[in-house]
């Protein structure tokens, strides 16, 4: 049971070449703050995160976004088998509405947008794989 709760290094995009190969493709979907890309690999699902200082100046905010994204992906990793998924922050958060990373609205906003993007990405993966159900 503990193995299914892990998020090992093998489930992450780590090298510049791995990120570049996914970035070369057109983005699948966008939300107000995030963009998601995907690339078929035929191997286990892997996640890459690009959360730059330009859009989230404080480290605590970047870490919150990464933590939420990793957890959302980890729980749905089987749906993305054979694909590299890259999630990129592309817009700043409104500092007046969300003054700190500890603010509940920021966590709720990020979690909601990430969940929405992963839902869309899962449908896209299923469509491109020939509409195979995730349970197979």
Curated annotation (Swiss-Prot):
Q: Which InterPro entries match?
A: Ribosomal_Su5_D2-typ_SF, Ribsml_uS5_D2-typ_fold_subgr, RNase_P, RNase_P_CS
Q: Give GO terms: molecular function aspect only.
A: 3'-tRNA processing endoribonuclease activity; ribonuclease P activity; tRNA binding
Provide the Gene Ontology terms for cellular component.
Answer: ribonuclease P complex
The EC number(s) attached to this protein equal: 3.1.26.5
GO terms for biological process?
tRNA 5'-leader removal
Assembly and partners are described as: Consists of a catalytic RNA component (M1 or rnpB) and a protein subunit.
Q: Which reactions does this protein catalyse?
A: Endonucleolytic cleavage of RNA, removing 5'-extranucleotides from tRNA precursor
Please describe what this protein does: RNaseP catalyzes the removal of the 5'-leader sequence from pre-tRNA to produce the mature 5'-terminus. It can also cleave other RNA substrates such as 4.5S RNA. The protein component plays an auxiliary but essential role in vivo by binding to the 5'-leader sequence and broadening the substrate specificity of the ribozyme.
Taxonomy, superkingdom: Bacteria
Record HAMAP family: RNase_P
For the protein in the UniProt heading, the enzyme class is: hydrolase
Cited Gene3D superfamilies:
3.30.230.10
Name the UniProt key words of this record, in alphabetical order. Answer: Endonuclease, Hydrolase, Nuclease, RNA-binding, tRNA processing
Q: Which organism is it from?
A: Burkholderia mallei (strain ATCC 23344)
Query: Which family is this protein grouped under?
Result: Belongs to the RnpA family.
The protein's name in its UniProt record: Ribonuclease P protein component
Pfam annotation, one family: Ribonuclease_P
**What's the name of its gene?**
rnpA
């Amino acid at each position: 049971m503990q193995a299914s709760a892990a998020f090992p290094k093998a489930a992450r995009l780590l090298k510049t070449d791995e990120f570049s190969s996914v970035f070369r493709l057109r983005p699948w979907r966008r939300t107000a703050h995030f963009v998601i890309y995907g690339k078929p690999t035929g191997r286990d699902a892997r996640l890459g995160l690009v959360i730059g200082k330009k859009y989230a100046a404080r480290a605590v905010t970047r870490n919150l976004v990464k933590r939420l994204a990793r957890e959302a992906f980890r729980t749905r990793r089987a749906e993305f088998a054979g694909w590299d998924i890259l999630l990129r922050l592309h817009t700043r958060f409104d500092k007046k509405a969300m003054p700190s990373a500890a603010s509940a609205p920021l966590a709720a906003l990020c979690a909601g947008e990430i969940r929405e993007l992963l839902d869309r990405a899962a449908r896209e993966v299923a469509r491109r794989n020939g509409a195979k159900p995730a349970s197979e």
